[in-house]
């Protein structure tokens, strides 16, 4: 069947991925990326569990020191975004810059293996007509992770397997139990690795960003309260504002220049359009005229109809069929045609338009 390097985090999904491929006859080598400097759950407990799985399956286990990459492309990226009122999406950045690309390069250079596999819930297929690899949603829509994978390149898709893409999470757990894997009953991680390692995003950010007090204002500029730093907030946030108001208020803008958090009632917070930068096309080589598609602007939000208008360079304008709430600069806007990912990019500040 050939050789494959499986990315092992120490969780049940990557464990089952290794188990399935091993059972299918692949020569499997486990690879765990050492991501964080200092102590953290994702680096200690996960490494131990990954090593246990490799021992159980009888396959080699390699630990790759990726701490400098993680610091540069994730920690610094997240901090610099929050400093200027942007809410970055570290998972998509990590997949491209820390995990898939570097792991493919390492596996080829160190192991002579040109194919990797991970426990992500998504699917990959090759389109003979277009000559392009396509990324599709997972069969298990609730677990689908295609939103975080939009930024992979054609080369990365060509060298990657997603064995869990056709399965449900329940089936994954069942296979883990049947194989008697040591991670079969391990609880699922609910947070970003940064949060798991530091307790909360606030704790993590406060290590790097100075708390700077400012005003919380409404859309008319009326002062409603005060904050201890705009990096403590994100667009669409309702809880933790510390404001007494007759109606629920939501964060609608983070003004880095004035150091203000702007809030509004939900009915005044909709956006009819936004612009996107750093567009990465997957199913298409790009567009030269407007197209209709669906767009997902947050991981847990549904895809909604949109008109996609090309701008200069790697930028697009998205015009929504209906105004959308919580359009967040720094998050991804991922375009879909049914289950197929057309591509995606990063939402810009409204001022950039």
From Swiss-Prot:
Active site per the UniProt annotation: 94, 193
Binding positions (ATP): 7-14, 33, 119
Places the protein is found: Cytoplasm
Keywords, in A-Z order: ATP-binding, Cytoplasm, Disulfide bond, Nucleotide-binding, RNA-binding, Transferase, tRNA processing, tRNA-binding
tRNA processing among keywords: yes
PANTHER family linked: MITOCHONDRIAL TRNA-SPECIFIC 2-THIOURIDYLASE 1, TRNA 5-METHYLAMINOMETHYL-2-THIOURIDYLATE -METHYLTRANSFERASE
Pfam families, per the entry: tRNA_Me_trans, tRNA_Me_trans_C, tRNA_Me_trans_M
Marked site: Interaction with tRNA: 120, 331
Record's catalysed reaction(s): S-sulfanyl-L-cysteinyl-[protein] + uridine(34) in tRNA + AH2 + ATP = 2-thiouridine(34) in tRNA + L-cysteinyl-[protein] + A + AMP + diphosphate + H(+)
Any one of the GO BP annotations: tRNA wobble position uridine thiolation
Molecular-function GO terms, alphabetical: ATP binding; tRNA binding; tRNA-uridine 2-sulfurtransferase activity
Organism listed in the record: Picosynechococcus sp. (strain ATCC 27264 / PCC 7002 / PR-6) (Agmenellum quadruplicatum)
Disulfide links within the chain: 94-193
Function: Catalyzes the 2-thiolation of uridine at the wobble position (U34) of tRNA, leading to the formation of s(2)U34.
Official protein name in the record: tRNA-specific 2-thiouridylase MnmA
The protein's enzyme class: transferase
E.C. no: 2.8.1.13
Family to which the UniProt record says this protein belongs: Belongs to the MnmA/TRMU family.
Location of the region described as Interaction with tRNA in the Swiss-Prot/TrEMBL record: 143-145, 298-299
Gene Ontology CC entries for this record: cytoplasm
Cleaved signal peptide residues: none
NCBIfam families in the record: PRK00143.1, trmU
Gene: mnmA
Superkingdom of this protein's organism: Bacteria
């Amino acid at each position: 069947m050939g050789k494959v390097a499986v990315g092992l985090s120490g969780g049940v999904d990557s464990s089952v991925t290794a188990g399935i491929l091993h059972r299918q006859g692949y020569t499997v080598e486990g690879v765990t990326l050492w991501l964080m400097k200092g102590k953290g759950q994702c680096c200690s407990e996960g490494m131990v569990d990954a090593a246990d799985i490799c021992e159980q399956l009888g396959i080699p286990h390699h630990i790759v020191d990726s701490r400098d990459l993680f610091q540069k492309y994730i920690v610094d990226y997240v901090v610099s975004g929050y400093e200027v009122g942007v809410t970055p999406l570290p998972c998509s950045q990590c997949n491209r810059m820390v995990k898939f690309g570097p792991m493919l390069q390492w596996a080829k250079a160190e192991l002579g293996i040109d194919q990797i596999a991970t426990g992500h819930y998504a699917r990959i297929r090759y389109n003979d007509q277009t000559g392009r690899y396509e990324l599709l949603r997972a069969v298990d829509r609730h677990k689908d992770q295609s939103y975080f994978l939009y930024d992979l390149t054609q080369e990365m898709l060509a060298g990657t397997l997603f064995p869990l893409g056709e399965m449900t999470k329940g089936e994954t757990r069942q296979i883990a139990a049947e194989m008697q894997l040591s991670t079969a009953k391990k609880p699922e991680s609910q947070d970003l690795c940064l949060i798991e390692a530091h307790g909360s995003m606030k704790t993590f950010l406060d290590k790097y960003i100075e708390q700077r007090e400012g005003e919380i204002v409404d859309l008319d500029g009326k002062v409603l309260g005060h904050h201890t730093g705009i990096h403590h907030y994100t667009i669409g946030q309702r809880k933790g504002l510390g404001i007494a108001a007759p109606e629920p208020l939501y964060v609608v803008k983070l003004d880095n220049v004035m150091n203000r958090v702007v809030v509004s009632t939900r009915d005044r917070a909709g956006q009819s359009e936004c612009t996107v930068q750093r567009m990465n096309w997957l199913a298409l080589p790009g567009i030269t005229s407007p197209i209709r598609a669906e767009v997902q602007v947050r991981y847990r939000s549904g895809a909604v109809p949109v008109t996609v208008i090309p701008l200069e360079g790697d930028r697009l304008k998205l015009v929504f069929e209906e105004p959308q709430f919580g359009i967040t600069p720094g998050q991804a806007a991922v375009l879909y045609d049914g289950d197929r990912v057309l591509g995606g990019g990063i939402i810009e500040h409204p001022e950039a338009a």
